[in-house]
Amino acid sequence: KDIPKMISLMNVEKIDITAARTLVFSGDDLISGYESKFNFAAGTAFSGSGKVIFVLNSVDQNGESNIVISFERDNERVRSTLSATRYVVTEYGIASLFGKSIRERALSLIEIANPENSEKLFNTAKEHGYIYPDQIYRSIAANYPSRLETVKTFKDGLELKIRPVKASDEDMMRRLFYKFSDESKYYRYFTHVKVMPHKNMQKYLSVDYDIIVSIVAFHQTVNIEKIVSESRYAAYPSGDSYEMAFLVDEEYQGRGIATFMTNYLIKIARERGIKKLVASVLSQNRKMLEVFDKVTVKPVKQYDGDTVELEFRL
């Protein structure tokens, strides 16, 4: 507690799908022993802004996943992570686990597993009840565009992490939805949406990073990580244009987040050769119209009753 911002890096052989237990390397008990390493990790968890990071290869020498449902052998080398895990890292990405449910942890670790093992791991996790029985597996998730990850500082020094959405973000996206007022929900969905069950949110987050791209902004503090904004575009069936929309947590509005997220989406669309983005906005939604007027590409507007149709020619 007296040493802030401590970092503990733990290299392990395997980890279970909830990040509750690990398999330490054989021979890693020399000198001080692996018990002292886990004690150090536990101490790091109590440090102000401390981070405990577990690092491992996604597969072993036989090509088997090092992220496992349970440990079938070498139980004498299995150790508890002492609930200290904040991040797990493989060559396929980083899983942020602090404050997450077992289901969120399982999905996060599947996302950083070797793509050749991830579907089997997904199905086994479903059989053991770690994830929803109707959870959708999308092999396209292996195409996660990590190059789109960035960090942006906004007014009042607010730092947000920006990245493509993942299936494991479902609970955080649902919490964001329930924070919005009825008016904001109506402006976004053009109807009175009261609830957002798993089946609807899962479908919403089933993006392919190609014809549907969704970018989210995270605010991370010592105690919590939450999504405060999302922007997305999706191709019309005709394929000649893409519909764009965004939302920002009402608590975080007025800091330029919406303008940045929209401009970032336009930048991605341009890089991918998309020629036209469109948006439909209710005429009384002045805040959203003001944001679209501020972006780098000025829209062509058409008025259709209570709706304003905007076209962004890239």
Model features per residue range: what roles?
Residues K1-I136:
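Conserved phosphate- and dinucleotide-binding cores of soluble alpha/beta proteins
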